[in-house]
Amino acid sequence: MVYATDLKATLAGVPVPLLHAEGPVSPDVAGALAAGARDRLGATYGLGVTGVAGPDSQGGRPVGTVYVGLAGPGGGTVRQLTLSGDRDAIRAATVEAALAELLAAVRARSAELPA
C-alpha cells in the first residue's frame, strides 16, 4: 500500500507523467496501482485504490470520490465509487468495496477452471 504520490511512482510503478497529468486520484492511477501491485509482487491479482476520504476535496475531486482498480489474469477493471460519511466511514467502505471486487473476480475465475 502506498499513500504518498511519489511512492505511487517509485514503489508501485505508476508512470510519473500520468501522475502529473491526472493527479493521484484518477481511474487511470487506480488501474496503474493495481497493475503495479500485480506485476511487482508476481501476484495473480492486484488491487489499487485511490480517492478522497476528506475532510477536504483534492485536485477538484469531491470528498467520497474513490477509484478501485483490479488487475488479474483476464485484464483490468476500474470502478468509481461515490461514498459519503466521515473519513473513517469512507475508508471502511472503500476497503469493503475493494475486497468485494477481488472476491468476485476470484470466484468468477474459479468457476472457469476445470473441476
Give the location of each predicted region:
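Short alpha-helical segments enriched in small residues
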Residues: M1-A115
